[in-house]
Amino acid sequence: MLDGVARTMIVDKRPIIAITMGDAAGVGPEIIVKALRLKEIYDVCRPLVLADAAIISDVIKSLNSTLKLRRVRSSDRAKGEFGTVDIIDLNNLDRKEVIPGQICIACARAAMEYIARAAELAQQGKVKAVVTAPINKEAVIQAGYGDVGHLEFFARITHAAEYATMLVSGPLRVVHLSTHYSLKEACERVSKDKILAKLRLTHNSLQRWGINYPRIAVAALNPHGGEGGLLGSEEIEQIQPAVKEAQESGINALGPFPADSVFTRAIKGEFDVVLAMYHDQGHIPVKVYGFERSISVALGLPFIRTSVDHGTAFDIAGRGIASSQSLEEAIKVAVRLIEGKLV
């Protein structure tokens, strides 16, 4: 009571979402600034950027933006006020080392520090989701990390037993049996056990996000689905047995279907998700269908993580022409997943 009037504290129900800057020499800082100029982002969440504040400040100036930076020491200080970027400043870069469009070992190390901090906050429940801007895999390897991507790094530090990448572009969702392997290695990894594990992970993830009985189409590995063994035996020896066992356990797995038609069928609404056998088999249709709005969702981590579906784009870094659409969509999808709704 204050002067006889009960005062009720207004609780901000918008989730705090950690956004990592990625590689400072790429387009990450630029697309973050561009995305956070939009009120629609602040309408649904409280963005919290993990970055080097000096780099973000430089980009704000270069884009002639009116955004203001507010350094915060902890996630609970994020206010999510439109026009202001709440940032945990790791202060881990020297501007002189950052040359847009060039491999930068210091940038790679800094980027990994942002995502490690974001994972820590997510596991502590201090942020509801993590959204990542791109890192440069070549720079990350040169910096001494053995992880070839965000997902592998997150999986290692969280001890995730089974994990996968799901790309999303409108109605098209694609989970990958494997991603960062050579084509030869990817084909060698097509096995009944691996397929079955990914089917279970996909089924459970989509159920958790509101699709009660997900229809999972499994893509064939070989042309025309192998033509009964004439063009390869993986469908008969590995994929079909995995689909059959999944069905027997209550998973609505279907296929294998020829890869040249299954993605179109998914776009038309026949399936909820497609399980692709390797990186390019899944990435190409998603990016052809909707390159700028496609995003990545991690399956199997102990927290929600979404990402842009593009790289550091060194060829256009620092020029002010990068699109932030993928990042905007990644943030919005993260909010929906927090609410338990993939669609």
Language-model features: where?
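Contiguous, glycine/small-aliphatic-enriched amphipathic segments in soluble metabolic enzymes
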Residues: 2-150, 189, 193-277, 281-295, ...
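Short, flexible loop segments at boundaries between secondary-structure elements
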Residues: 157-172, 299-315
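Ligand-binding beta-strand-loop-alpha-helix segment within the catalytic cores
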Residues: 167-189, 194-196
